[in-house]
């Protein structure tokens, strides 16, 4: 499905259950691989990015048996504190999470590990993370372009020290990589220098490690990791608020959506979509096992800081296209280091619907209006594809989304679920 055509409709109506959390699936697989024993993981996402992490863990010596489709059951027999050197280059595909967290795991290997990915991943900087590993005594090198380091990366040797500093303003995954490294070592102090972007994703890493018996003590901008992971026996990955957000947006713009299997008490940073949607004027109420989102017929522009929830930016931008007034999304400069430069991509694609968009270094402004159908390009980015589909679902006329298959990275059933709530979806 390279290209999808949508026909705009007045309202959506239906029920969806979003897929398992991509972020949670990555973290659970890695934590289980760091154990000496066996762990049963339930509700693991079956999507390209998570398959990349499965491949990484297996290449480092974990035995992973997988059963099911879409929502996997995975039995992981970990490699403990002694991952083996991979026999081949680790291909992380398009998964930045796999590559960055994999750098931390590679530092535990007695030998050399090479990690790479597709063209998009090889354009994403990892210099700050590699510099942190080098400060621990690890030989860590990337491809140098104009003073910055990019994949492929080559990592050899184990850490010689028990304290490390890392900048937190490019990617929170650099911090998470070092926390997993600390768990593998049994002890490490991680000092975060400067602003920590997307801190709730670091909180997810800490929560995962704590569920595996690792102590992580936070003192200001530092994290003290003590103890090695121990299998909890069984662990269930929660459903994904990032994926749920697109259907929250659909219900807010027009109609009513019932979204099952999401937890309003979750620590997932993208749960904030509920708060933002209410602020814009939609109704959201809790039901047993999920939420119901209902349009009130009018959305209003908001000013919102999404520094801690960057994956919500395309979703909020899609809603903003239908809101009265201006929506300003601030402190999201780190979006420029995602699969694509999402700020630039949104600023280029949304105007094709007839919407006015202004872009700054770390902000985006959208002037709401009456979008009309257009031919738009996801640029191979899964979140762009789904956000553009939200706009196309209500835009007047037909919308064509190019590179629609990008959704397979995190939500393989997205187009089927979109059709199930009344949006005419055609593969063209």
Curated annotation (Swiss-Prot):
PROSITE patterns: EPSP_SYNTHASE_2 (PS00885). Keywords: Amino-acid biosynthesis, Aromatic amino acid biosynthesis, Cytoplasm, Transferase. It catalyses: 3-phosphoshikimate + phosphoenolpyruvate = 5-O-(1-carboxyvinyl)-3-phosphoshikimate + phosphate. Phosphoenolpyruvate binds at residues 22, 96, 124, 173, 342, 383. The keyword Ligase does not apply. GO terms for cellular component: cytoplasm. Catalyzes the transfer of the enolpyruvyl moiety of phosphoenolpyruvate (PEP) to the 5-hydroxyl of shikimate-3-phosphate (S3P) to produce enolpyruvyl shikimate-3-phosphate and inorganic phosphate. This is 3-phosphoshikimate 1-carboxyvinyltransferase. The gene is aroA.
